[in-house]
Amino acid sequence: MIHSSNYENQKKLGIPFFAVPNTLKHFVDPGHGWYRVSREMLFRMDLLDKISSFSYQKGNWVYLEEDVDASIFFTRYKELFGELQIRVTTNISENMSSIRYYQPFQMGMGSGCL
């Protein structure tokens, strides 16, 4: 069911209904975890200036650290789109994740800058 206020939020943000993420990848290593979200989606959700350098970036993807930055994302998602109806697929590594070697997040960096 599409709530009209949520639909209006999507229109204001320029996010087509089909572009709202409904599946996220969650990467976990023995010490931490990250959710992968496109930089464009963070931009459209007005979150780029709220993400810390504890998250990482590579190309058009931002890997939100699971403690604070991912919570900010999920709270905003619920504000804009209503109930959280996101499927999460988890990739668990027994070793240190390669994400730790990506560039720390910076708002003006990355190939997805808008």
Question: Language-model segments: what does each one mean?
Answer:
Residues 1-29:
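Eukaryotic non-globular interaction segments with acidic/serine-rich, low-complexity composition
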Residues 23-25, 52, 61, 90:
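Short, flexible coil/linker segments at or flanking structured domains
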Residues 31-58:
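A short, structured beta-strand/loop element
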